[in-house]
Design a protein with these regions (language model features):
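Transmembrane helical bundles and short interhelical boundary loops of multi-pass, membrane-embedded
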Residues: 2-4, 37, 229-249, 279, ...
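Hydrophobic alpha-helical membrane-interfacial segments at the cytosolic entry of transmembrane helices
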Residues: 22-27, 199-220, 339
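Perimembrane helix-loop-helix junctions
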Residues: 1-5, 186-210, 221
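Start-transfer (signal-anchor) and selected internal transmembrane alpha helices
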Residues: 1-33, 115-116, 124-126, 289, ...
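Membrane-embedded helix bundles of polyisoprenyl
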Residues: 26, 30, 111, 124-160, ...
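Loop-to-helix entry region of an early transmembrane alpha helix in multi-pass inner-membrane enzymes
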Residues: 73, 88-108, 259-269
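Extracytoplasmic catalytic/substrate-binding loops of multi-pass membrane glycan-assembly enzymes
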Residues: 38-53, 66-78, 241-250
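Aromatic/glycine/proline-enriched transmembrane-helix motif characteristic
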Residues: 18-19, 107, 116, 236-307
Length: 390
């Protein structure tokens, strides 16, 4: 072996060691960021702790009979399971284990999705490591104790199966997401596009209500009424009278005194905008490549909460996740996840740190520019495909 060959081998080993060190550091930081679960927010003490104590002391059957919890049965079963750890760990930690566990599983599926794009190499590991350390991800789960990671996990799994051309499993995963949180509807425009592109047969959409109804059966057997479990989402939609719950979207600029007309106009604007985007995308005859699929999935979960009224500060969480995947599939969009982190992070600070609502408006401006750019990018890609075909 020559001296030059020896140098090349040593250089390669050094690069590999540095890469392994970098990956280990990312995962270690992600783990450390989730060790402190002591923060107790108003939502945690007002709702979660009340439900936790009631289920622990009276049982989940009584909780269902009295309609205590304001979430779906699927979520309620998971939440009730945390009381089994009552003698082992503090209730705040037990509750936060749900989204933290979802973070870990999501990390694996982010790896799997990026591995589809890169069958060889370390980029999938980097994608997983970066995801695990994204600020809005670990803050949402380990510190805030919210459950956005749970329904988003099944959106990620759904996207994975669609990329693998297994639509039945993709729709099943989505149905589970919808059975947990209504915010799963942000993914529906993407599913409609797949249907119009003949990637999903119509009958598979029946899985959504079927899985939801099946998930309700144990709750009904425990004493809940069918009317209660089937109208949970209707009740949630009318709970708050505001156009924007500090969401960095269009409605943060509209005074809440215009709630009535603003809600009606907002719903019309949202429907027309999403319908126009779906039709425009469906009419494109170019191949639906995996790169395009992840881009369309991101636009779906970012455009939908952007144009819908009554959104909350955390509702761009799926966009925070999918934007990272998009950056690995389309490296020239590397800045997109950074900007989504910034806009979502600014919105988080109002609730968690008591900062000015003006920061949400800055986040809304960032999202306006970002979503407009993504739509323009989609258009440019479609035009390029048409030119190549001709």
């Amino acid at each position: 072996m020559t001296t030059e060959q020896t140098k090349v081998i040593h250089t390669s080993k050094s690069k590999l060691n540095l890469e392994l060190l970098g990956l280990a550091t990312l995962f270690a930081l992600g783990l450390l960021s989730r060790l402190d679960t002591s923060l107790i927010t108003i939502d945690m003490s007002k709702y979660y702790f009340t439900w936790y104590r009631y289920i622990r002391d009276s049982g989940i059957a009584v909780a269902f009979q009295e309609g205590l919890m304001e979430y779906t049965p699927a979520f309620s079963y998971l939440f009730a399971s945390t009381t089994l750890l009552d003698s082992v760990i503090p209730k705040v930690t037990a509750i936060k284990l749900i989204p933290i566990t979802a973070d870990v599983i999501s990390t694996y599926f982010v790896y799997r999705i990026v591995r589809i794009k890169y069958p060889r190499g370390n980029k999938p590991y980097w994608a997983a490591g970066v995801f695990f350390i994204l600020p809005t991800i670990f803050i949402n789960s380990a510190h805030w104790g919210q459950m956005d990671a749970l329904y988003t996990l099944f959106i990620i799994i759904s996207l994975f199966f669609f990329l693998k051309e297994k639509p039945l499993l993709g729709m099943l995963a989505y149905a589970l997401s919808f059975s947990i949180k209504f915010q799963a509807i942000f993914f529906i425009p993407f599913l409609v596009i797949l249907f119009l592109k003949k990637k999903i047969p119509w009958w598979q959409f029946l899985l959504i209500p079927t899985v939801y109804v099946v998930s309700c059966i144990p709750a009904v057997l425990l004493g809940a009424s069918w009317q209660t479990v089937l109208t949970i989402y209707l009740g949630q939609s009318g709970k708050y009278r505001w156009l924007s719950g500090n969401a960095p979207n269009l409605y943060t600029f509209v005074p809440n005194e215009y709630y009535g007309p603003g809600l009606v106009i907002g719903l019309i604007v949202a429907f027309c905008t999403l319908a126009a985007w779906i039709i425009f995308t469906a009419l494109d005859k170019s191949d639906l490549t995996r790169e395009r699929m992840v881009l369309l999935a991101l636009i779906s979960v970012s455009l939908t909460p952007f144009v819908l009224p009554k959104m909350h500060d955390r509702y761009f969480y799926p966009a925070d996740v999918l934007s990272l995947i998009v950056a690995f599939y389309n490296p020239n969009l590397w800045f997109v996840p950074i900007l989504f982190q910034l806009s979502s992070g600014l919105a988080y600070t109002v609730y968690l740190l008591g900062t000015s609502i003006g920061l949400v408006k800055i986040g809304a401006i960032i999202n306006t520019v970002l979503i407009a750019y993504l739509l323009a990018y989609q258009l440019s890609r479609q035009v390029s495909s048409i030119r190549e075909a001709s």
